[in-house]
Amino acid sequence: MEVQMKKRCISAYVENQIGVLAKISGLFAGKNYNLDTLTVGETEDPTMSRMTIDLTCDDLTYEQIIKQLNRSVEVIKVIDFTDMPITKKELLFIKVNSCKEADKQEIFRIAKTFDLLVVDYNRKSVLVQCVKTVSKNNDMIALFKDMFVNRIEVVRGGSVAIEALSTPDR
């Protein structure tokens, strides 16, 4: 029987203290679990941080991860997003270097068409911000790679996710 790997998303509320991020990420490393992304930030309560963890694993490994997180003293609450509608986005910056004036005009056109934000530019470069799903960000990277061959730099932040307010019609 073949082990089926699935993309997963977990949210964990943790104590907002020095060393908690290292301990939680160490928990994953110590068990040889690989994280796709890990994003952490302070919540509306300054004593808590919220982690969004993306990973690809089989069902058994996923169960073990949830149990490990729940056993950790610093973890206040774990939310398994597997079977719930969520809103999830990733921050992406794309910098295009060695731009001519025509390139800049094209980048501004792309930004307007795809609802991207030009956050900075100078005579030679343009910096675009994209906050979309991982899949749509991958499409943006492919588009910019094709149009501006060997002239782009990409920086990605991890995903952040929250329970959706409504279930989308499918």
Describe the predicted segments one by one.
Residues 1-49, 57-170:
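Long, contiguous binding/interaction regions
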